[in-house]
A protein has these predicted regions:
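Short, well-structured active-site flanking segments
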Residues: 113-128, 334-339
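Bacterial N-terminal signal peptides
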Residues: 10-20
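Beta-lactamase-like hydrolase cores
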Residues: 27-96, 159-165
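Active-site-adjacent, His/Asp/Glu-enriched structural segments that form or flank metal-binding
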Residues: 121-195
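Active-site SXXK
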Residues: 99-117, 175, 265, 396
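Small-residue-rich helix-loop
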Residues: 88-90, 281-459
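Second-shell loop/turn segments in exported
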Residues: 45-53, 90-99, 141-151, 246-252, ...
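A small/polar active-site loop signature that marks catalytic segments
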Residues: 181, 188-341
Length: 459
């Protein structure tokens, strides 16, 4: 079955993303404290917003807006608000829950604030020694540095092509990769370096890497690159280290824009990419510090042990709502919207692909999911926005734990649907989908030679 899924380069990349998502949802059990103590109770569905059913934001325990909530076994926190801040539903909003992968919204917010949506991750190639262009040989080492969380097969082949255009086809030396370099979602710099070396050499290149290269070049209509087979043979070994003194920068590869990397990350809830970006921000405690400082979130409302949502983390629904609103504001400052980074239910591939798929619901929910099957006895979340036929957009946070995650998801969908129906029913957001493979095949991502810093010279 896998060979069918990876018949195209981009499909292969997205399969990796999906696989990482599926594996990442499992986490070790934890008996951590700070678990909420409220259990959901039975309530009848509402007919709409009225004075008799208006939420009471002061009632944080129990059902402040009972009509939107249905019976469920487990713990639940809910906060739904209109854009102007009116409370639609509130339950246990100051209790702490495990948000699972919804914590990626916090990582995303701080990344956008720190780097900006146009930011590109750089992967640089350095060399030592001399180049003999008469026989295409570099006598010296090739060094690769960078922390691009989206670096894959096709990017390595692209760099091989650029070296070929500089007259290099053989490296009589070692491949040195920086400790922070990773490729194909592999945390090990050593393994990533070995994959890079094999992908560089056409004779050792895997079928997956070959398809990745062909499909991406086809996707961006770069037929010229397909007329030859890029290849660089490295005769030495893979070593881990920094660029040595005297190394000369030769090429720099630019990733897709951060906003496009985030869209893929969040659609597939890719834990590896979230942790890599989190590392570049200083780790979970650095992200938490920004939330406390800039968003004025009470430090007692958030506990972060990861930037992906793996493990034991704690957020209150109130804190998560502040993050969601800040994320919308940050995007709007850059003329973007939540649909530019989050999955649109029933349309985008990934975690919301099979939810809200009814023709009347499709495209009416934009949200981040979260799932941990074992941690905290099972944790599930849904955080985002919904649109209704009344024209209202409602922001919502639903956090569940200590129960069956499948039932939690069904309950979350029921809450969203009930709120939408109370406002005339669901309505789709304006959204023009772009294939995720195209987002990662940004044509501006070409390797650029370092002008004025290196001139090939004969040995």
């Amino acid at each position: 079955m896998m060979h069918l899924l990876i018949r195209s380069a981009r499909i292969f990349t997205l399969v990796l993303l999906s696989s990482a998502f599926a594996l990442g949802q499992q986490a070790p059990s934890s008996n951590a404290s700070q678990s909420p103590a409220t259990q959901v109770q039975t309530a009848a569905p509402p007919t709409g917003f009225s004075s008799s059913t208006a939420a009471n934001p002061q009632s944080n325990n129990g059902l402040a807006q009972p009509g939107f909530l249905t019976p469920i076994y487990g713990l639940q926190g809910v906060l739904a608000e209109t854009l102007d801040g009116a409370t639609v539903a509130a339950q246990s909003i100051d209790e702490k829950f495990n948000p699972a992968s919804s914590i990626k919204l916090a990582t995303t917010l701080v990344a956008l604030q720190s780097f900006g949506p146009e930011h590109r991750f750089l992967t640089s190639v350095w060399v030592t020694g001399t180049i003999d262009r008469t026989n295409g040989t570099l006598t010296g080492d090739l060094i690769v540095t960078g922390r691009d969380p989206s670096f894959h097969y096709e990017h390595a082949v692209l760099l091989a092509r650029e070296l070929n255009q500089l007259g290099i086809r053989t490296v009589n030396g070692n491949l040195i990769v920086a400790p922070g370099f990773t490729m194909n979602f592999d945390w090990s710099a050593k393994h990533s370096g070995e994959e890079f070396l094999n992908t560089f050499d056409a004779a050792r290149r895997s079928g997956n890497a070959t398809r990745a290269w062909i499909d991406e070049r086809t996707l961006v209509s770069d037929n010229e690159s397909l007329r030859s087979v890029p290849s660089v043979v490295i005769t030495g070994q893979v070593q881990i280290g920094s660029a040595p003194t005297g190394a000369i920068p030769l090429l720099t590869h630019k990733s897709s824009k951060l906003v496009d990397v985030l869209k893929v990350l969040l659609c597939y809830s890719n834990n590896f990419m979230a942790e890599r970006i989190g590392e570049s921000l200083g780790g979970p405690q650095a992200v938490r510090a920004v939330l406390v400082d800039k968003l004025k979130i009470n430090p007692d409302e958030i506990l972060m042990s990861s930037t992906s949502g793996l493990g034991v983390n704690r957020f209150t629904p109130r804190a998560m709502m502040k993050i969601l609103r800040a994320l919308r504001d940050e995007l709007q400052k850059n003329r973007l919207s939540l649909s530019d980074i989050l999955p649109v239910a029933g349309i985008d591939p990934g975690t919301l692909e099979d939810r809200y798929t009814d023709p009347l619901e499709r495209g009416s929910v934009i949200a981040k999911t979260g799932t941990l099957v074992r941690t905290d006895g099972g944790a599930s979340s849904l955080v985002g926005q919904m649109k209704t036929k009344s024209g209202r957009v409602v922001l919502f946070v639903i956090l569940n734990q200590r129960g069956n995650v499948v039932h939690f998801r069904q309950n979350q969908d029921g809450i969203v649907t009930a709120i939408q129906n109370s406002l005339g029913g669901p309505a789709p957001f304006d959204y023009l989908p772009i294939r995720l493979s195209m987002r990662l095949a940004d044509s501006d991502k070409e390797a650029a030679r370092a002008r004025g810093e290196y001139e090939p010279r004969n040995q």
